[in-house]
Swiss-Prot record:
The keyword Transferase does not apply. Belongs to the GcvP family. This is Glycine dehydrogenase (decarboxylating). The gene is gcvP. The glycine cleavage system is composed of four proteins: P, T, L and H. Its cofactor is pyridoxal 5'-phosphate. The glycine cleavage system catalyzes the degradation of glycine. The P protein binds the alpha-amino group of glycine through its pyridoxal phosphate cofactor; CO(2) is released and the remaining methylamine moiety is then transferred to the lipoamide cofactor of the H protein. Keywords: Oxidoreductase, Pyridoxal phosphate.
Length: 954
């Protein structure tokens, strides 16, 4: 017992975020782990892992790290510098109400936001069902056959639609028509996408300016950005007569009242599902949608959820038609799309489940009535309202009074849209209140109330919707919140996310997404800011973004950043466009060759072809390093036309290559630029800077290295950093600087999730970030050491070390026991783990990345599980287990297996409780192994009829 005279102050820091919360192993555990690897100190391990030539000279420093409370106070102080006005700017972004049951149980629930892309279907059945609901919702509303599981934003989806049109159109034309009534950011992105590919873009009035003979496709906005609602049936028919493709960019809320694009004959529909319960968030993240006719489904980009069966014949969901994606087809892929917007798509689908078709239609009717009331008030003041028929958006010509009225509206707390030099536009939404209408009328000089007018309709009668939508029973469930809460919980219980166990996916960096980092994204000062508000209303955002850019520059050694790309793949695309525009500005527009090693991520070659570059593949040596001789030969061979090379560092094999600076020098000697893929930046922060070792541009995956959660497959952020000579060629945006080259619908991409990365930097500090990198390397080397002897670690440095991930070789098991990498992955589910990355970058292997956030206990549990799997394979080799009927081949095992008739030559205990599995709180796979072949041969991408569920249960 301590007496007062013995009292001493402790030096323990309970609120040290970096060392007490974010980094998993304790100092004592690190010492034990280092002994297993064979080192006395963490710095000794780091010195042996990183080549001295790439180490940064000065430590990463930017002030003392903050506690969680201090960081939240700083975020609050910054957020309060934003002005939250009512924004009626529209232009694809609208006020919406997020049902609290969805906000609390999905957006704020780590079971949903910490999951990974559902490549392992057995442990992803919950979000796959939610995404199937989303696809069904989109197909119903747009009247088309197949929808994907979301894209990055509406403008990107429109550009992707154009690319599909060029690919599948029978027309040989090389021009694309864009309705001038499309949103300006959509037009800008289409121009960006078309120019490097040699396609011309014609912007005009489709009634007077469209000649179908001249184009391979056309896109129409429905309703238009200024409110016009046109019937495009005749124009679409004319396009089809010449073999061209018709795309309609449609507002899904309007589609509850208006004729669908499919009924007009459209081939493709695109748009945003932001109106379905997702805040505007200064531009994102939001889930864009795309739906297509059945005939062109294989050309559609992005994830596609389909229905299949499991080993018992029960219904199961999976990602379908994956062979068309970038990780398979590389430069021949339909798109470079990798990350989508799964979390936001889930929210939108749940909004439809929450309200049902009657509720959503009622919301649309109320929005329209508000717009009509607004128009009546302005007409009473003597203004001519355009158009005559509309859904939610109207425009008035106010002449020289434009500036005065806009300022008066701001004084009333309302943002209106500046249209040209004499007009003002306004878009009404779900959140518009009567007081808002009255405030706008006052800004126009009126002094009356909403009670002075009778509600009525001004929708075009010939376009009123008569077809049904959202007919599946899931959209007609009991709307009591208790039922909604339980439905969301049931789905999340089917999934395996970071809230249950580590997700050791190589090249994915599934680290902690701390609760303190997540809290600010729902604050209205961040979530309720329209992306096109006047600059003085977003000063907090700009302060945060500028400081984050300063920190990212310090981390990378670059001189400037663009925060516009809203995924890693978009970052690659933006970086390559920057290089291309730099060459053109210097009179080197002929430089179009991009050197890419065979080990590169599939997005690299896919991104290169999107900017019109020719991919030249470079060999990789047996040890995983780039073949320097082959690289040199190809750089010399293509010197006259060399635009750039794309490399990943550390390499995709998880090793710091010694020759990286030499590779960069070679490219520069031959007139090219170096693109260093930042996917593996978690092994470099604080230890090595891309800008110091010869790279000219990189993207950073903020959803990896800087703690934005993966959301089950999105959102993400992929900002690009560049050296000073490339800074003038970074993406512009029509709503900010007016420069060309926009790559995202909003100038700062998915800005509302940037507080996550900023607060991570504030709480870690430079020293904490550096320590996190060291521990990420420690954890990977610890796993490699623990698995030594059971599995070969394929790639190591000359000192025998790996970087932040390691690749273990499971190929020998195929010959010795018949056990495949799939079997190992599915058996890990029985142990309660998501499998590591399978068969990439080497087929038949597993790439393991534990990150710095996992404790020694969790690392040991994983090692015990995968070592036990090796012993099960050994039992097959020795004849102690059947080669076909064994726990590996039958994995994953379900509760149905446990309680059903048991006729297997191994026990229930062996099946369901292998080493590593929890006995209490065990994760049970909801389905047995999913049949991938069946799913692709019998493609169903919408909710099956309710009778089929009964059939599957029989």
């Amino acid at each position: 017992m301590t007496t007062p005279t013995e009292f001493q102050f402790t030096d323990y820091q309970p609120y040290d975020f970096a060392n007490r919360r974010h980094i998993g192993p304790s100092p004592a555990e690190m010492t034990d782990m280092l002994k297993v690897i064979g080192y006395n100190s963490l710095d000794g391990l780091i010195d042996a892992t990183l080549p001295p030539s790439i180490r940064q000279k000065a430590p990463l420093v930017w002030g003392a790290p903050m506690t969680e409370r201090e960081a939240l106070d700083k975020l609050r102080e910054t957020a309060n510098k934003n002005k939250v006005l009512v924004s009626l700017i529209g232009q694809g972004y609208y006020g919406t109400i997020t049902p609290p049951v969805i906000q609390r149980n999905i957006l704020e629930n780590p079971a949903w936001y910490t999951a990974y892309t559902p490549y392992q279907p057995e442990i992803s059945q919950g979000r796959l069902e939610a995404l199937l609901n989303y696809q069904t919702m989109i197909c119903d509303l747009t009247g088309l056959d197949v929808a994907n599981a979301s894209l990055l934003d509406e403008a990107t989806a429109a550009a992707e639609g154009m690319a599909i049109a060029e690919r599948v159109a029978k027309s040989k034309a090389k021009a694309f028509f864009v309705d001038a009534d499309c949103h300006p950011q959509t037009i800008a992105l289409i121009r960006t996408r078309a120019e490097p590919l040699g396609w011309s873009v014609i912007v005009g009035n489709p009634v007077t300016d469209l000649d179908p003979v001249d184009v391979f496709g056309a896109i129409f906005q429905y309703p238009g950005t200024h409110g016009h609602v046109h019937d495009f049936t005749g124009l679409i028919s004319r396009l089809h007569q010449t073999g061209a493709i018709a795309i309609v960019a449609a507002d899904i809320l309007a589609l509850t009242l208006l004729k669908s694009p499919g009924e007009m004959g459209a081939d493709i529909a695109v748009g945003s599902s932001q109106r379905f319960g997702v805040p505007v968030g200064y531009g994102g993240p939001h889930a864009a949608y795309m739906s297509v006719k059945d005939a062109i489904k294989r050309s559609m980009p992005g994830r596609l959820v389909g229905v299949s069966v499991d080993a018992r014949g029960n219904r199961a969901y999976r990602l379908s038609l994956q062979t068309r994606e970038q990780h398979i087809r590389r430069e021949k892929a339909t798109s470079n799309i990798c990350t989508a917007q799964v979390l936001l798509a889930v929210m939108a689908s749940m909004y439809a489940v929450f309200h049902g078709p009657k509720g959503i239609k009622a919301i649309a009717q109320q929005v329209h009535q508000k717009a009509v009331l607004m128009a009546k008030g302005l007409e009473k003041l003597g203004y001519k309202v355009e158009p005559e028929t509309f859904f939610d958006t109207i425009t008035v010509d106010v002449g020289h009074m434009q500036g005065l009225i806009l300022r008066a509206a701001v004084a009333e707390g309302v943002n209106l849209r500046k249209v040209g030099e004499t007009k003002i536009g306004m878009s009404l939404d779900e959140r518009t209140r009567p007081a808002t209408l009255e405030a706008v009328w006052r800004a126009f000089g009126g002094n009356f109330t909403i009670a002075d007018f009778e509600p009525s309709y001004r929708l075009p009668k010939g376009l009123l919707r008569t077809s049904d939508y959202l007919t599946h029973p899931i959209f007609h469930m009991n709307r009591a919140e208790s039922e909604m809460t339980r439905y969301i919980r049931r789905l999340s219980d089917r999934d395996l996310a970071l809230d249950r166990s580590m997700i050791p996916l190589g090249s994915c960096t599934m680290k902690l997404n701390a609760t303190a980092e997540m809290l600010p994204i729902t604050w209205p000062e961040f979530s309720d800011i329209h992306p096109f508000v006047p600059a003085d209303q977003a000063l907090g955002y700009r302060e945060m973004i500028d400081d984050l850019i300063e920190k990212l520059c310090a981390v990378t050694g670059y001189d400037a950043f663009s925060m516009q790309p809203n995924s890693g793949a978009q970052g690659e695309y933006a970086g390559l466009l920057t290089i291309r525009n730099y060459h053109i500005a210097n009179g080197d527009g002929h430089r179009d060759v991009c050197l890419i090693p065979t080990s590169a991520h599939g997005t690299n070659p896919a991104s290169a072809q999107m900017v019109g570059m020719k991919v030249v593949v470079v060999k990789v040596r047996e040890n995983g390093d780039i073949d320097l001789d082959d690289f040199r030969a190809k750089a010399e061979q293509h010197a006259a036309n060399l635009a750039c090379c794309m490399i990943t560092y550390p390499s995709t094999h998880g090793v710091f290559e010694e020759t990286v600076k030499e590779i960069c020098d070679l490219v520069h000697e031959h007139g090219g630029q170096v693109y260093l893929d930042g996917a593996n930046m978690n092994a470099m922060v604080g230890l090595s800077r891309p800008g110091d070792i010869g790279s000219d541009v990189s993207h950073l995956n903020l959803h990896k290295t800087f703690c934005i959660p993966h959301g089950g497959g999105g959102p993400g952020m992929g900002p690009i950093g560049v050296k000073a000579h490339l800074a003038p060629y970074l993406p512009g945006h029509p709503e900010t600087d007016g420069r060309p080259g926009a790559v995202s619908a909003a100038a700062f991409g998915s800005a509302s999730i940037l507080p996550i990365s900023w607060s991570y930097c504030l709480m870690m500090g430079g020293e904490g970030l550096t320590q996190a990198t060291k521990v990420a390397i420690l954890n990977a080397n610890y796993i490699a050491a623990r698995l030594r002897g059971a599995y070969d670690v394929l790639y190591k440095s000359e000192t025998g070390r790996v970087a932040h991930e390691c690749i273990i070789d499971t190929r020998p098991l195929v010959d010795s026991s018949g056990v495949t990498v799939d079997d190992v992955a599915k058996r890990l589910i029985d142990c309660g783990f998501h499998a590591p990355t399978m068969s990439w970058p080497v087929a038949g292997t597993l790439m393991i990345e534990p990150t710095e956030s996992e404790t020694k206990a969790e690392l040991d549990r994983f090692c015990e599980a995968i070592l036990a799997i090796r012993e099960e394979a050994r039992a097959i080799e020795d004849g102690r287990m059947d080669k076909v009927n064994n726990p590996l081949k039958n994995a994953p095992h379900t509760v149905e297996d446990l309680v059903g008739e048991w006729d297997r030559p191994y026990s229930r205990e062996q099946a369901c409780f292998p080493p590593g599995a929890f006995r209490v709180d065990k994760y049970w796979s909801p389905v047995n192994r999913v049949d991938n072949v069946y799913g692709d041969r019998n493609l169903i991408c919408t909710c099956p009829p309710v009778e089929s569920y009964a059939e599957a249960a029989e």
